[in-house]
From Swiss-Prot:
<dbReference type="InterPro" id="IPR033129">
    <property type="entry name" value="PEPCASE_His_AS"/>
</dbReference>
<comment type="subunit">
    <text>Homotetramer.</text>
</comment>
<keyword id="KW-0456">Lyase</keyword>
<dbReference type="InterPro" id="IPR018129">
    <property type="entry name" value="PEP_COase_Lys_AS"/>
</dbReference>
<keyword id="KW-0597">Phosphoprotein</keyword>
<keyword id="KW-0120">Carbon dioxide fixation</keyword>
<comment type="function">
    <text>Through the carboxylation of phosphoenolpyruvate (PEP) it forms oxaloacetate, a four-carbon dicarboxylic acid source for the tricarboxylic acid cycle.</text>
</comment>
<keyword id="KW-0602">Photosynthesis</keyword>
<dbReference type="GO" id="GO:0008964">
    <property type="term" value="F:phosphoenolpyruvate carboxylase activity"/>
</dbReference>
<dbReference type="GO" id="GO:0005829">
    <property type="term" value="C:cytosol"/>
</dbReference>
<feature type="modified residue" description="Phosphoserine">
    <location>
        <position position="11"/>
    </location>
</feature>
<dbReference type="GO" id="GO:0048366">
    <property type="term" value="P:leaf development"/>
</dbReference>
<protein>
    <recommendedName>
        <fullName>Phosphoenolpyruvate carboxylase, housekeeping isozyme</fullName>
        <ecNumber>4.1.1.31</ecNumber>
    </recommendedName>
</protein>
<keyword id="KW-0460">Magnesium</keyword>
<keyword id="KW-0963">Cytoplasm</keyword>
<keyword id="KW-0021">Allosteric enzyme</keyword>
<dbReference type="InterPro" id="IPR015813">
    <property type="entry name" value="Pyrv/PenolPyrv_kinase-like_dom"/>
</dbReference>
Length: 967
């Protein structure tokens, strides 16, 4: 191959320009960025692995690009033959190269987005999550509310300062990229950004170029594969690193922008520092649903670690604040306090373990005296948490630390009041205000940890108790009897059980978790979430167990409804719960309900799940109103469309009217955390997007659907569910086909999360977790769970009455919920390719199932055509040239990885599959070994032929990076 005529072979750079002939906009530098990173990468590849391998990568890319041009399946076969002819080491290098190039393409795109001038799209236009054109900008939102919606500035200000967005970080599905690589990616992004800055000197340029090369090489030389599964503590540390890197500084920066935006509409005061605009919670180390690795001890560790990190972050800023507040003028209250502190601290005035202000602070610097005391207590708070974490005990008495936020805020508020009283408000509104806002947002625990547990586990505990008390089996009681017993116990005072209760491992685990909640400070925790909740007794059971385990300030109990039947029954269950007097008195007019997007989608398909979630929210809000309760909806959205993902602000703006009402909780899932908080500007945009969309939804709710639209949706949902279930649950060939046609069985090898892929080890689709279910279909680019059901539903109503097509088009144009639902599926079709799925079938599926695969692909094409008709589009994504351009740029890389994956799966599953290795032409074949062979040694324990397992995992990671969603 080395002597092949290279003139004919266009470089990848030229290929890119052929694929995307036109710039999308004036400032479109995407192709330029992409080409620069790839040129650098190919140079590195040649240096490390020789010209032959570089040419192989280019040849592979070219075949892939030819397939993308004409979709000729013969090209896939040629590509397959070329890839399978590589030896083990080379095949790992090729898979690694394409995975790496996709990561670089993502980085080029992020830099482009950060720099592109925002092209205003008309409201409601859909574009991808990461696209700069789909902003909910806080300034524009405020202006729009005042100018277009005729709201008074004061109304807007009141609504804004009373609203709360609580972002809940979860570990699953875990980011499939290792943290070691994420950090290198961040540096590549920064270098690329600086390279294209306007005022760069030739020397700067040369140094940045070298730095870029260095980081690309370092990333390529890092093992992308996690060799051991992460523990929940690892996941928690990974999640917390975003606070350190971006969120901690990002929150006060964002709140300053809100102040500025308010000023621009004529409000001359700032958002109060204690207004809970943004809150953060976490599930990492608290979510034990189906994850046996999250033990009570893990929960305790995670809370202590977060407390230590919070104290450390405050501690790292306090000396800067002491430098800033050097004033001597202060009010009487502060003067008295500073004098007291000065008198009491004379004895031990030298503190050598501090870097600044280590000697006694003179009395004419009262702010510093007071902040010096805050610093001492922060230091002790951090050290005590560290001791407890490392040894389980600490010699530092608790009273020398901060135990609640109020005592931490008090001296800071005193400084703030004093500065304002002395005419120094401008100084007070500097770093001190930022610090106060951080304390209000993050408290002493950094995040509040939610606890999540399956309802059956609580039932088991209560069953053990009732049997021990010899009053029967709780498990066998009717719902009425359960409620009656729980309420009589909750109204009484006597303890239910003593230390003599016989406990299995599972029961001890549940009770120990409640003991940890009782032992740690209240501000460590958020909600107690019950998954698979179906009845009021599920909620009352947790209330009783909290009391029995001496939880002084019980956590709010949040039922999670996720299966279709549970969503349908949720409003009635909530009404029954609110009709219990004891419970209504307990909740003080506030209730939270979580709705799950992923399991409802797996259970009934995306169409019916989306509509049922919409209706359930409307009904739940009505029930809450009836009982005078303020309801907060907690949205458990995944990162992928199949699990309820998609652009944040559009998802918020398409919720039913009155369901958000200024308080929103939403999960930010593992693989989306990096896209939301990976960098300062991303963090800023995420906070802005959630805040602006929540405000707009509350003050200018979307329209309610017309009665005829509802009737049509109800009818279509029945058909969609029928079709989905007839294939997924009733078709006898389906499970076998799914296992053969996708890498589902091999998913567990990726070590992406601490949680097992299945709730129970044996069983069919229903026991599979939603994440691997979606992941497997995403890998083959067939995306079945997202679109299955839509086609049958559209077809049914259009055949019934041809005028319905106009009704559907009217719904698409006027109703945000319907539009977002359709647009998300259209985006997934743009990322799909049934030709690739057919290749997996041909290689991996037994011949008697081929006709079934063809039937599914026919349904795919029919659904796509109907969808375009409803949206009034001739072509996929015609309304979004940005996204279309970005997907076109990636397709050739992803296709290579798909072909590589399909053939690798074939070789793993069929060891007798015959491949023809090509002869070595390069000089290296004479040598004993070449650099690529070292890669095989990274996985010495694989049960397959050398190199196969790593090649497979690299293709999985690469495809996930290319499609920008994993599970």
């Amino acid at each position: 191959m080395a002597n092949r005529n290279l003139e004919k072979m266009a470089s990848i750079d030229a290929q890119l320009r052929l694929l995307v002939p036109a710039k999308v906009s004036e400032d479109d530098k995407l192709v330029e960025y992409d080409a620069l990173l790839l040129d650098r990468f190919l140079d590195i590849l040649q240096d490390l692995h020789g010209e032959d391998l570089k040419e192989t990568v280019q040849e592979v890319y070219e075949l892939s690009a030819e397939y993308e041009g004409k979709h000729d399946p013969k090209k896939l076969e040629e590509l397959g033959n070329l890839i399978t002819s590589l030896d083990a080491g080379d095949s790992i290098v090729v898979a690694k190269s394409f995975s790496h190039m996709l990561n670089l393409a993502n980085l080029a795109e992020e830099v482009q987005i950060a720099h592109s001038r925002r092209n205003k799209l008309k409201k409601g236009d859909f574009a991808d999550e990461n696209n700069a054109t789909t902003e909910s900008d806080i300034e524009e939102t405020l202006k729009k509310l005042v100018v277009d919606m005729k709201k008074s500035p004061q109304e807007v200000f009141d609504a804004l300062k009373n609203q709360t967005v609580d972002l809940v970080l979860t570990a699953h599905p875990t980011q499939s990229v290792r943290r070691s690589l994420l950090q290198k990616h961040g540096r590549i992004r920064n270098n690329l950004t600086q390279l294209y800055a306007k005022d760069i000197t030739p020397d700067d340029k040369q140094e940045l170029d070298e730095a870029l090369q260095r980081e690309i090489q370092a990333a390529f030389r890092t093992d992308e594969i996690r060799r051991t599964p992460p523990t929940p503590q690892d996941e928690m540390r990974a999640g917390m690193s975003y606070f350190h890197e971006t969120i901690w500084k990002g929150v006060p920066t964002f709140l300053r922008r809100v102040d500025t935006a308010l000023k621009n509409i004529g409000i001359n005061e700032r958002v109060p520092y204690n207004a809970p605009l943004i809150q953060f919670s976490s599930w990492m180390g608290g979510d034990r649903d189906g994850n046996p690795r999250v033990t009570p001890e893990v929960t305790r560790d995670v809370c202590l670690l977060a407390r230590m990190m919070a104290a450390n972050l405050y501690y790292s800023q306090i000396e800067d604040l002491m430098f800033e507040l050097s004033m001597w003028r202060c009010n009487d209250e502060l003067r008295v306090r500073a004098d007291e502190l000065n008198r009491s601290s004379k004895k031990n005035s030298v503190a050598k373990h501090y870097i600044e202000f280590w000697k006694a602070i003179p009395p004419n610097e009262p702010y510093r005296v007071l902040l010096g005391e805050v610093r001492n207590r922060l230091y002790q708070t951090r050290e005590r948490s560290r001791h407890l974490l490392a040894h389980g005990y600490s010699d530092i008495p608790e009273e020398e630390t901060f135990t609640n936020v109020e005592e931490f805020l008090e001296p800071l508020e005193l400084c703030y009041r004093s500065l304002c009283a002395c005419g120094d408000r401008a100084i007070a509104d500097g770093s001190l205000l930022d610090f106060l806002r951080q304390v209000s947002t993050f408290g002493l625990s950094l995040v509040r940890l939610d606890i999540r547990q399956e309802s059956d586990r609580h039932t088991d505990v209560l069953d053990a108790i009732t049997k021990h008390l010899e009053i029967g089996s709780y498990q066998e009681w009717s719902e009425e009897k359960r409620q009656q017993w729980l309420l009589s116990e909750l109204s009484g005072k006597r303890p239910l059980f003593g230390p003599d209760l016989p406990q299995t491992e599972e029961i001890r685990d549940v009770l120990e978790t409640f003991h940890v909640i009782a032992e740690l400070p209240l501000d460590n925790f958020g909600a107690y979430i019950i998954s698979m909740a179906t009845a009021p007794s599920d909620v009352l059971a947790v209330e009783l167990l909290q009391r029995e385990c001496h939880v002084k300030h019980p956590l709010r109990v949040v039922p999670l409804f996720e299966k279709l039947a549970d969503l349908e029954a949720a409003p009635a269950a909530l009404a029954r719960l609110f009709s219990v007097d004891w419970y209504r008195n307990r909740i003080n007019g506030k209730q939270e309900v979580m709705i799950g997007y992923s399991d409802s989608g797996k259970d009934a398909g995306r169409f019916s799940a989306a509509w049922q979630l919409y209706k359930a929210q409307e009904e739940l809000i009505m029930v809450a109103k009836q009982y005078g309760v303020k309801l907060t909806m907690f949205h458990g959205r995944g990162g992928t469309v199949g699990r309820g993902g998609g652009p944040t602000h559009l998802a918020i703006l398409s919720q039913p009217p009155e369901t958000i009402h200024g308080s929103l909780r939403v999960t930010v899932q593992g693989e989306v955390i990096e896209q939301s908080f990976g960098e300062q500007h991303l963090c800023f945009r995420t906070l802005q997007r959630f805040t602006a969309a929540t405000l707009e939804h509350g003050m200018h709710p979307p329209i309610s659907p017309k009665p005829e639209w509802r009737a049509l949706m109800d009818e279509m949902a029945v058909i969609a569910t029928e079709e989905y279930r007839s294939i997924v649950f009733k078709e006898p060939r389906f499970v076998e086909y799914f296992r053969l046609a996708t890498p589902e069985l091999e998913y567990g090898r990726m070590n992406i999360g601490s949680r097992p892929a299945k709730r129970r080890p044996s069983g069919g689709i229903e026991t599979l977790r939603a994440i691997p279910w979606i992941f497997a279909w995403t890998q083959t680019r067939f995306h079945l769970p997202v679109w299955l059901g839509f086609g049958a539903a559209f077809k049914h109503v259009i055949e019934k009455d041809v005028r319905n097509i106009h009704v559907l088009q009217e719904m698409y144009n006027q109703w945000p919920f319907f539009r977002v639902t359709i647009d998300l599926v259209e985006m997934v079709f743009a990322k799909g390719d049934p030709g690739i799925a057919a290749l997996y079938d041909r290689l991996l599926v037994s011949e008697d199932l081929w006709s079934f695969g063809e039937q599914l692909r026919t349904m795919y094409e029919e659904t796509k055509e109907l969808l375009l008709q409803v949206a009034g589009h001739r072509d996929l994504l015609e309304g979004d040239p940005y996204l279309k351009q970005r997907l076109r740029l990636r397709d050739s890389y992803i296709t290579t990885l798909n072909v590589c994956q399909a053939y690798t799966l074939k070789r793993i599953r069929d060891p007798n599959y015959n491949v023809k290795l090509r002869p070595h032409i390069s000089k290296e074949s004479i040598e004993i070994s070449k650099p690529a062979d070292e890669l095989i040694t990274l996985n010495p324990t694989s049960e397959y032929a050398p190199g196969l397992e790593d090649t497979l995992i690299l293709t999985m990671k690469g495809i996930a990076a290319g499609l920008q969603n994993t599970g």
